[in-house]
Amino acid sequence: RELRGVPCIDLEKTASKRKSCVVSRSFGKRIEKFQELEEAVASYCLNASEKIRSENLVAKAVMVFVRTSPFQKQFGFYSNSRTVDFPIATNNSIEIVKNALSVLKVIFRKGHRYQKAGVMLTGLTDAENNENLFSSAKDERINRLMRSIDNTNYRYGRSTLSLASAGVRKSW
């Protein structure tokens, strides 16, 4: 029927909300130091949390993954990932980075030359539907802080305001 121009499936009128948000990169050079990997993961968390805030979403969990090159056999291949659930769904960059870095400490193995790392925020839901019994004035202050950071970065360029854990030089 579609070949005759008769649609079989109706088109969605509105785009459906995303269910996850991934930010990952391959590094320009192999990374061996934990601090450089930590900066990269923190930076990816900041980008991912900014993306979900722009869509008015919150995440229930963050997954961190790292890997070495499968083609450099002399160094051995290593790949690992871990997920941590948030007690309350969030889009707070500070909370996301803190949890992601705690996971990174578990999966990092010294002596490997990492080629790629990334973060995935999962279980995304509408921020409006995220009210709970434990919401407080502190949460509202953090939300205002995140909006201020996002507005400043939008106005003056990405990463104008950032967390110290994301590094300054970004040599990776």
Where are the model-predicted features located?
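DNA-contacting surface of Y-family translesion DNA polymerases
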Residues: R1-G111
